């Protein structure tokens, strides 16, 4: 059960995040704009949060318009800040970058403040997901009782700051969450579900128990040494590949929110090479390298659970 002290820390941590974001955006406004390019994605409609996306059309924004969208995006934490038709369960994504020039002292202040904001965001997420002791289904109600209308994923999302990047290229990443299990691991999970069964639409409680028992029997019939995998697809994500000329290295970043690239005023107006984010089309994905997939046999579809052949 969440204590009064925990609720106080939840609220005070969130207020700190809000305050720090206000002061950060003011600091960023004081920098010289070198370049900015961000890409708006279509809204996720209510009820469509888990729909598979085969195409995503992006719209490009540059210059001061991109900066304005970026600064508003950092502080977009509540559903009243968006269309009523847009889902409050899906975080708003705005890939891109703003490139700013400032003196060394201001750069250090900005980097330090962003690190502090990210620490607060991690603490806020930990309060909700770990310290509350609540199961996932109960967290939503608890958080929204304290902070009505909060878009939790937006509040969790960290900020990315870059120093002196030479080039930035944007793209899309298709990933899977893969976890390995033994037969006994899965049997243990199913046993827990059977001990505290719930009603899952469209089945009655009794029908759901029958399904769980059938799944349990199917797993129990496998040899003890069977290797099992959960291979669950993750919604396609925007990414950025950043090249640092001074270090001669490329780094790939998740890019759900605009990155902040800082450039020292002492080194002159070095404008980086910024690429576009093209529309996503699942039918035209080109893989640089696609290793041969391990043969898998689906055994429990709802869990994305496979037998490794």
Curated annotation (Swiss-Prot):
Keywords: Cytoplasm, DNA replication, DNA-binding
One Gene Ontology term from the biological process aspect of the record: DNA replication termination
Disulphide-bonded residues: none
Localization, UniProt: Cytoplasm
Listed Pfam families: Ter
Gene3D superfamilies: 3.30.54.10, Replication terminator Tus, domain 1 superfamily/Replication terminator Tus
Gene Ontology CC: one annotated term: cytoplasm
Alphabetized InterPro entries for the sequence: DNA_replication_term_site-bd, Tus_dom1, Tus_sf
Gene Ontology molecular function terms on file: DNA binding
Entry's family note: Belongs to the Tus family.
Protein name listed in UniProt: DNA replication terminus site-binding protein
Gene it is expressed from: tus
């Amino acid at each position: 059960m969440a204590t009064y002290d925990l609720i106080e820390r939840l609220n005070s941590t969130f207020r700190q995040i809000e305050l720090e974001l206000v002061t950060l955006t003011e600091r960023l406004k004081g920098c010289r704009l070198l370049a900015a390019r961000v890409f708006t994605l279509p809204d996720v409609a209510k009820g469509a949060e888990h729909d598979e996306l085969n195409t995503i059309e992006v719209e490009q924004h540059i210059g001061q318009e991109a900066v304005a969208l970026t600064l508003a995006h950092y502080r977009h934490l509540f559903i009243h800040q968006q269309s009523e038709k847009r889902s409050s369960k899906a975080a708003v994504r705005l890939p891109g970058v703003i490139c700013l020039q400032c003196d060394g002292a201001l750069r250090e202040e900005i980097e330090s403040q962003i690190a502090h904001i990210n620490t607060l965001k991690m603490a806020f997420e930990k309060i909700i997901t770990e310290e509350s002791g609540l199961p996932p289904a109960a967290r939503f109600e608890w958080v929204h009782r304290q902070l009505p209308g909060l878009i939790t994923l937006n509040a969790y999302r960290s900020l990315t700051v870059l120093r002196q990047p030479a080039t930035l290229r944007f793209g899309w990443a298709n990933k899977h969450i893969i976890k390995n299990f033994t037969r006994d691991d899965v049997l243990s999970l199913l046993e827990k579900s059977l001990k505290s069964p719930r009603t899952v639409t469209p089945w009655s409680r009794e029908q759901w128990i029958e399904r769980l028992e059938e799944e349990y029997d199917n797993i129990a019939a496998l040899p003890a040494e069977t290797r099992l995998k959960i291979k669950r697809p993750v919604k396609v994500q925007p990414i950025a590949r950043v090249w640092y000329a001074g270090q001669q290295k490329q780094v790939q970043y998740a890019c759900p929110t605009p990155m902040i690239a800082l450039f020292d005023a002492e080194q002159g107006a070095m404008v980086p090479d910024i690429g576009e984010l093209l529309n996503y089309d699942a039918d035209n994905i080109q893989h640089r390298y696609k290793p041969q997939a391990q043969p898998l046999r689906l055994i429990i579809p709802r869990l994305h659970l496979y037998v490794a052949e």
